[in-house]
Amino acid sequence: DPRICKNAVRREEISYGDMLLLAQKGAQVLHDRSVALAQAGGVPITVRSCREGGAGSIVCKTDEDASVVGVTQKKSGRSRLAAITAVGGALPSIEKEKIAVTALERAEITVFAVAAGERFMSFYVVRDDAERALQLVHDALIAAKE
């Protein structure tokens, strides 16, 4: 979300699988069921900003990217923690985990836990630090590569 992450990187295309993971992990771009239905029907989705216009991104059947393609946050109910999740083919990775955790610790943000699965890693931080943590993880794992 460019409103939260000032140097967000626009992707021309993103795979259904990566967008589905981002939606499930908190991205408020598309609902996860809409992505699953589009994938089942082979229907590409064009996502654009309603404020800025522009080319946007296409969610479609494409080779899944081998890099980190997105970072999102999820604040659940009454929990005092928020999950900052990075998604992409480069994950999970001990190297990427160290890079992200180091960036967060340098900013004096405590990482309470790290969870990983196929194509994602989540970093659990205090809810009040979520937006700053999202920016830091984005900068460490995506912007540094651009």
Regions inferred by a protein language model and the residue ranges of each:
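C-terminal catalytic "cap/lid" subdomain
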Residues: 1-146
